Structure formats: C-alpha cells, structure tokens
Amino acid sequence: MKKIINPWIGLENEGYNCFACAPHNPCGLKMEFWEDGDDIVSYWTPNDNFQGWIKTLHGGIQATVMDEVGAWLIARKLQTSGMTTNFNIRYRRPIPTGENVTLEARAHLREQKKMFAIIDVTLSVKGRVCTEAELTYYCFSKEKAIEEFKFRGCNIEE
C-alpha cells in the first residue's frame, strides 16, 4: 500500500479547505488516502464529535467519508476531478465512535462509461462491512480539472 500525496496542499490561499481532506481545516475530518492495488483506501478514527446518536457515527458523516474516498479514486486512478451525480447508500450496522475505533473506507472502480465512473465503496470496522454505497461521478475533462479545480495530478509517495 502506498500513501497518496494530497495534490491540493499549498492551495490554501486559493480556497482549498475541504471538510473531508484538508489537514488544516479545524472542523474537518482530515482524511488521508492510500492506493491498495486497484482500490483507494482511507483509515480514519471517528471521534465523539461526529456522533449522530450516543457513541454512533452520524450517517451524514459516513456518507461524506464515502463520497470523499470515491473522489480520491477519481483523482488518483483517472487523474482528473469530478462531481457526484448519484449516491445510493445502505447502512447495514451502526459504526461506533471513539479513540479505539478505526474505520476503513475502501473504493473500487466498477465501471467507466465515457465521462461517468461507477464506484463501489464500503465502510468497515474490524473487517466487518457496516455501510456500502454505489456512487456515480461525472468526470471533468483534464483541461477543466486543471483550469477550474486547480488539479495538478495525483501521485503516490515513493
């Protein structure tokens, strides 16, 4: 597994402050990502500030984590930016919060049709799938990704 370098680091003065992945956002999730073969993975500890119910991770935060790992799949595997156009989620079991919980978010590109990518995402705790989703992303042209979204390519650490 190789760590993915955040391509937006250094763009804070141009507006980069993503709730999910900006390491400097004081309210954010501060997610980091790894490439694991064909998959993109993030390991994240959901602290108690992200509860929906007592010691239970809020469903909207789960959706955010899934959407973000899908976006990073687009960035790393397809080398562009995109936007979510469809999101179907299934909550199978609650995800606990707390310092001793490590959540694995895993995204896999199922299919690409022209400018659309269909991505399967799972959230697991201790190897047990808690939430799963199918996401559809519209993938921007490389030119638009560069010009409008400051995309400079997405690389891994050596």
What are these model-predicted stretches?
Residues M1-D48, F149, C154:
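Non-catalytic linker/capping segments at the edges of enzyme domains
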Residues M1-I9, I95-T97, H108-E158:
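HotDog/MaoC-like acyl-thioester-processing domains
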Residues L29, M83-T85, V101, A117, ...:
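Hydrophobic core residues within well-ordered beta-strands of beta-rich domains
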Residues K30-E32, R90, R106:
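Short, surface-exposed charged micro-motifs
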Residues V41-V65:
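A conserved, well-ordered hydrophobic junction motif at loop->secondary-structure transitions
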Residues V41-Y43, N88, T102-E104, I118-D120, ...:
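Beta-strand secondary-structure signal
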Residues W44-P46, Y91, C139:
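Hydrophobic residues in beta-strands and at strand termini
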Residues V69-E104:
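Hydrophobic beta-strand-centered segment that forms part of the acyl-chain substrate-binding groove
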